[in-house]
């Protein structure tokens, strides 16, 4: 369910705006998207796992808030991010 350290480092490297950047909205959204996709796969086999489903909803809400913030601050970065991650909006 969780992402590996290598995958997380790759996401940070790909979406970071500067060297060592782990807190930018782009990086946070990319990591949340990876975790959401992993949990979505988990639910295909474990339909009754409601405890994890609540965590998924929390992650989706957090990602939505970060995306709203990014859209408000810089529409170009927002558009580029949702296109590269394949998030529909």
UniProtKB/Swiss-Prot annotation:
Tagged with keyword Cell inner membrane: no
The organism's place on the tree of life at top rank: Bacteria
GO biological process: translation
Pfam families named in the record: Ribosomal_S15
A GO MF label: rRNA binding
Keyword Hydrolase among record annotations: no
Keywords: Ribonucleoprotein, Ribosomal protein, RNA-binding, rRNA-binding
GO cellular component, one term: cytosolic small ribosomal subunit
Subunit structure comment from the entry: Part of the 30S ribosomal subunit. Forms a bridge to the 50S subunit in the 70S ribosome, contacting the 23S rRNA.
Its biological purpose: One of the primary rRNA binding proteins, it binds directly to 16S rRNA where it helps nucleate assembly of the platform of the 30S subunit by binding and bridging several RNA helices of the 16S rRNA.
Protein family membership: Belongs to the universal ribosomal protein uS15 family.
Xref: HAMAP family: Ribosomal_uS15_B (MF_01343_B)
PANTHER family: RIBOSOMAL PROTEIN S15, BACTERIAL AND ORGANELLAR, SMALL RIBOSOMAL SUBUNIT PROTEIN US15M
UniProt-recorded name of the protein: Small ribosomal subunit protein uS15
Lineage per the UniProt record: Bacteria, Pseudomonadati, Pseudomonadota, Alphaproteobacteria, Hyphomicrobiales
Name of the gene encoding the protein in the UniProt record: rpsO
């Amino acid at each position: 369910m969780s992402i590996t350290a290598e995958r997380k480092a790759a996401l940070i490297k790909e979406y970071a705006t500067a060297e060592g950047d782990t807190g930018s909205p782009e990086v946070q959204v990319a990591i949340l998207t990876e975790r959401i996709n992993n949990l979505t796969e988990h639910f295909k086999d474990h339909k009754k796992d409601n405890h994890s489903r609540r965590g998924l909803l929390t992650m989706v809400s957090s990602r939505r808030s970060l995306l709203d913030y990014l859209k408000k601050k810089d529409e170009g970065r927002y558009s580029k991010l949702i296109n590269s991650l394949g998030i529909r909006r």
